[in-house]
C-alpha cells in the first residue's frame, strides 16, 4: 500500500478548492423542508388505595417533561425524498423526590436520538407513493408509534386511497410508556413471565392493508377499513365510519362509529396461561359545533368478561377515542391496549370557545368493568368507574398552543373498596 502525506499548505489548498465548488447555503436548502416541535409538560397525580394502577402517562409527581423533535425532508429529484427526524424525549425531571428519582435533580446529559429516517418515492401522475425505513406507522391501532416498515399507497381518485404495509420491527420505547405491557395488568406475579410476554408481543412482523376514504364523492362521508396480521399474536380488523353535516361556515354536526376486532393466536394465549381471548371494541358518538359551543355524547364497549383482550397496539390508537375522558382509558382493567374484563362507558363533553381562541370545557364518563380475574395481589380493575375533567385550551397562534386539564378518576370495587386519582397536565407546544 502506498501512503500519501499532505503538507499543511496542500491541505489548505484542497480545502479552498472544495469550498469554491460548494453550493451556497440558500441554494443547498431550497428543496429542504424543516419541521419541528418543542413541547413542555408539567404533570402531577395523587392516588389513594392504589387500585387504579400507573398505566397512565401521568404516573409521576411534579414531573417536568420536555420533548423536542426536529426533522427535515430533502427533495432529491425524480420523485425521491429523504426524511430524517431527531428526537429528545428522555427528560422527566421530577420535582418530587421518591425511589425513582431519589435526588429530584434535572437531567442535562441525555442525548438526541434518531426517531425517523426513511426514503419516500412518489409517482404523482399515477397516484402512487412508497415509503421505506423507520417511520410513524400511522395505523388505526397506533397513535405515533414508530417502526421499521415499508408502506405503499395508491390513490386512484381524490378522496380514496388503498394502502399496504409491512412492519419488520417496532419502536423499543415510547416517550409516554403507552406500548402494551402485561406488567400493568396485576394478573401475573412472576416478573420473568411478564418480561417474556412483553418482549413477545412486538417480537414478530406485522402485515396489513387498508381502504381509506375521505369525503367520498363530496358527500361528507368517511370510510376507513383496516386489516392486519401481527404474527403469532393476533389478527386485527377494523372499520371507522364517519359522516359530517355542515351547519354553516364554521359549524357542523358529526356522527362517528368505530369497530375494532381481533382473533388472538393460540400460542399467545398459552403464554398468558389461557386467560386471553379474541376481543371487540364498539364506539359511537356524535359531536356538534355551533356558535362557539361544542358538545359530544357517546358510548363505548370493549373487552370480554373474565378475559384479557388486546384492543389497540399502542396508546388508544387513532380512531377518535381521545374524546373519552383523559385517564379512564389508561386505568387498570379498562386500558384499551390490553384490558381485563368487559368495559362499558357512557361519556359526554361540553365546551365554549371565547373570542381570542380560548376554550373552556367539561368532560364526564360513567360506567364500569365486569371482571373477576384475580391473583390475590389486589384489584385487577373491575367495578364501577367514573371520571370528571376540566379542560382549558388557548391557541395563541397556529404555531404556539397552550392547554391543560384536571381529572378526577374514581374506582369502586366491592372487594377492594374505593380508589380515587387526581391528575393534572399543563402543556405548551410550539410547532413549525
Identify the meaning behind each predicted range:
Residues 182, 214, 218-220, 242-373:
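Detector for outer-membrane/organellar transmembrane beta-barrel domains
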Residues 127-140, 150, 162-166, 209, ...:
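Transmembrane beta-strand segments that form the barrel wall of outer-membrane beta-barrel proteins
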Residues 42-48, 90-96, 138-140, 170-174, ...:
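Gram-negative outer-membrane beta-barrel proteins
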Residues 111, 136-149, 170-173, 201-203, ...:
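Solvent-exposed loop/turn segments connecting transmembrane beta-strands
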Residues 2-133, 153-155, 242, 246-249, ...:
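Beta-barrel outer-membrane channel/assembly domains of diderm bacteria
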Residues 52-58, 102-105, 136-138, 180-182, ...:
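Extracellular loop and loop/strand-boundary signature of outer-membrane beta-barrel proteins
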Residues 166-206:
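Short, flexible helix-coil linker/hinge segments at the edges of structured domains or between repeats
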Residues 52-54, 99-102, 148-151, 179-184, ...:
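Flexible, surface-exposed loop regions and adjacent strand-edge segments
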Amino acid at each position: 500500500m502506498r501512503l500519501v502525506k499532505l503538507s499543511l499548505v496542500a491541505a489548505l489548498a484542497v480545502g479552498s478548492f472544495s469550498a469554491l465548488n460548494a453550493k451556497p447555503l440558500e441554494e443547498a436548502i431550497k428543496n429542504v423542508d424543516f419541521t419541528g416541535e418543542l413541547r413542555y409538560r408539567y404533570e402531577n397525580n395523587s392516588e389513594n388505595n392504589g387500585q387504579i394502577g400507573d398505566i397512565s402517562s401521568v404516573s409521576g409527581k411534579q414531573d417536568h417533561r420536555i420533548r423536542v423533535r426536529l426533522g427535515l425532508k430533502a427533495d432529491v429529484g425524480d420523485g425521491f425524498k429523504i426524511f430524517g427526524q431527531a428526537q429528545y424525549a428522555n427528560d422527566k425531571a421530577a420535582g418530587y423526590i421518591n425511589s425513582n428519582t431519589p435526588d429530584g435533580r434535572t437531567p442535562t446529559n441525555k442525548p438526541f436520538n434518531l426517531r425517523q429516517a426513511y426514503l419516500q418515492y412518489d409517482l404523482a401522475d399515477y397516484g402512487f407513493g412508497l415509503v421505506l425505513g423507520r417511520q410513524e406507522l400511522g395505523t388505526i391501532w397506533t397513535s405515533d408509534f414508530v417502526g421499521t416498515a415499508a408502506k405503499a399507497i395508491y390513490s386512484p381518485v381524490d378522496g380514496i386511497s388503498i394502502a399496504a404495509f409491512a412492519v419488520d420491527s417496532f419502536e423499543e420505547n415510547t416517550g409516554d410508556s403507552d406500548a402494551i405491557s402485561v406488567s400493568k395488568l396485576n394478573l401475573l406475579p412472576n416478573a420473568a413471565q411478564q418480561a417474556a410476554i412483553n418482549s413477545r408481543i412486538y417480537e414478530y412482523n406485522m402485515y396489513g392493508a387498508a381502504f381509506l376514504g375521505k369525503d367520498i364523492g363530496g358527500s361528507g362521508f368517511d370510510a376507513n377499513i383496516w386489516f392486519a396480521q401481527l404474527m403469532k399474536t393476533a389478527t386485527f380488523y377494523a372499520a371507522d365510519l364517519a359522516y359530517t353535516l355542515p351547519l354553516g361556515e364554521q359549524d357542523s354536526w358529526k356522527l362517528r362509529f368505530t369497530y375494532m376486532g381481533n382473533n388472538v393466536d393460540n400460542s399467545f394465549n398459552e403464554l398468558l396461561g389461557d386467560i386471553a381471548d379474541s376481543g371487540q371494541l364498539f364506539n359511537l358518538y356524535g359531536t356538534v359545533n355551533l356558535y362557539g359551543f361544542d358538545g359530544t355524547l357517546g358510548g363505548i364497549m370493549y373487552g370480554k368478561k373474565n378475559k384479557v383482550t388486546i384492543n389497540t397496539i399502542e396508546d388508544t390508537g387513532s380512531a377518535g377515542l381521545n374524546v373519552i375522558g383523559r385517564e379512564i382509558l389508561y386505568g387498570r382493567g379498562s386500558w384499551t391496549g390490553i384490558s381485563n374484563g368487559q368495559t362499558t362507558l357512557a361519556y359526554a363533553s361540553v365546551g365554549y370557545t371565547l373570542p381570542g381562541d380560548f376554550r373552556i370545557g367539561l368532560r364526564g364518563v360513567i360506567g364500569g368493568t365486569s371482571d373477576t380475574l384475580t391473583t390475590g395481589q389486589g384489584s385487577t380493575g373491575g367495578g364501577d368507574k367514573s371520571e370528571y375533567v376540566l379542560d382549558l385550551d388557548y391557541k395563541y397562534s397556529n404555531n404556539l398552543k397552550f392547554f391543560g386539564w384536571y381529572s378526577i378518576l374514581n374506582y369502586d370495587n366491592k372487594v377492594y373498596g374505593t380508589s380515587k386519582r387526581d391528575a393534572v397536565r399543563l402543556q405548551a407546544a410550539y410547532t413549525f
